[in-house]
Amino acid sequence: MPTPLILHDDRLLPADPATRAIARRLYAQTAALPIISPHGHTDPAWFATDAPFANATELLLVPDHYVFRMLYSQGIDLDQLGIPHADGSRAPVDPREAWRVFASQFALLRGTPSALWLNHVFHQVFDLRIRLDAGSADHYYDHITAALQTPAFRPRALFERFNIEVIATTESPLDTLEHHATIRDSGWTGRVLTAYRPDAVVDPEHEQFASALQQFAALTGEDVMQWPGYLCAHRQRRAFFAAAGATSTDHGHPSAATADLSPAEAQRLFDTVVRGQATPAQAELFRAQVLTEMAAMSVDDGLVMQLHPGCFRNHNRQLFERYGRDKGADIPMRTDYVHALKPLLDRFGNDPRFRLIVFTLDETSYSRELAPLAGHYPALLLGPAWWFHDAPEGMWRFREQTLASAGFYNTVGFNDDTRAFLSIPARHDVARRVDSAFLAKLVAEHRLDEDEAMEVAIDLAYRLPKQAYKL
């Protein structure tokens, strides 16, 4: 007999009955609030074309490296799952067969946030009431794939059903933003913004850096092989992104290093970089200098700056060579912020025109570095628990370790940071439940009155992300 799939009404709320009752009341005030998704990686083409999603595998498995990295860790070849190769080709695998492999291994996700999110999607979005396993694989595949061909499951209809008020995608400076233009011109009222992510033309160690610079020059008409022209090209593209609705930039660097070189020093370093002769230390210094230059541009154009540092990207060389980037082989690293951010903060940390939202994969930095920095510098805010830490436990640790020094109001609420479109309501629901549980504990301990906790819960779910990202 199939096992029922049940979402308990009190999931993630405290076990203690009195505290749980408080958490229920807090959650009830936030559960139906509109979703603010100020940072993520959904594909704007979905909303531009409003074409049906192909099938269960292409929508829920292939884009989700949270899921297939776990399967890979247990010996499942990515070809069995239909994951594209670096050159765009794929192994000849039937999507149904790939789904069967996934379903047969779904138990590997027990206790993980991926299981929480996916079970929410299955239950709430697709109205499935039995658990996914080998026996239910075909039922799931047929049910989901059939639903995806109906108007109610088109991207725009789901956007509206999910009560998304605004969502931001993330694009390279080389992107023409044609999909965002199509959305704006279509008459659809859904709000889909972009964000400026210049890593491809900032990181000398990126495998496509040289070709990206050539495209950067062709797109902007600037002499990007000279430091002043390179900076002008960034300003031009940032203005283009802002005109298309962007309110933020995003920077994914190996570290949080910043620098403040003189123009002459920066030009000499840049000359070395564009000749392809930069050492690892020089590449790091170049990224550091560009971050400070991006901050200077944010002071001028008002774009909110996000920094996502501290990840060793593509740790598995064989996997990277075969499948390319973003295939589940990224590993958190220890990250310094106190020394790394000082050159940038010396220039802009007190400037009311500047806003920097910093994330971390190094939880040891929360209470030692990031919360004290955000609790002091007016320009600095803390991004929520990110990536490897957006599990309920990670969200709880984030609150515990940052509250004393940064409070709630030097944080920015929640952002889902996902490619998995259908999981967005689930991710926000988890965050709202965890915050309700955390606040309920403070009320039960008489550290907050319930009316204060209610206001904070609404701020974290809705007001703070709108405010932080200028939405």
UniProtKB/Swiss-Prot annotation:
Q: What Enzyme Commission number does this protein have?
A: 5.3.1.12
Pfam families recorded: UxaC
Instruction: Supply the enzyme class, top level.
Output: isomerase
Q: Which domain of life is it from?
A: Bacteria
- Which reaction is catalysed here? D-glucuronate = D-fructuronate; aldehydo-D-galacturonate = keto-D-tagaturonate
Give one GO molecular function term. Answer: glucuronate isomerase activity
Q: List the disulfide bonds.
A: none
Q: In which pathway does it act?
A: Carbohydrate metabolism; pentose and glucuronate interconversion
Q: Name one GO biological process term.
A: D-galacturonate catabolic process
Keyword hit for Isomerase: yes
Task: Give the keywords, sorted.
Answer: Isomerase
Q: Does the keyword Signal apply?
A: no
SUPFAM superfamilies associated with the record: Metallo-dependent hydrolases (SSF51556)
InterPro entries on file: Metal_Hydrolase (IPR032466), Uronate_isomerase (IPR003766)
> Into which family does the record put it?
Belongs to the metallo-dependent hydrolases superfamily. Uronate isomerase family.
This chain's protein is named Uronate isomerase
Query: Its gene?
Result: uxaC
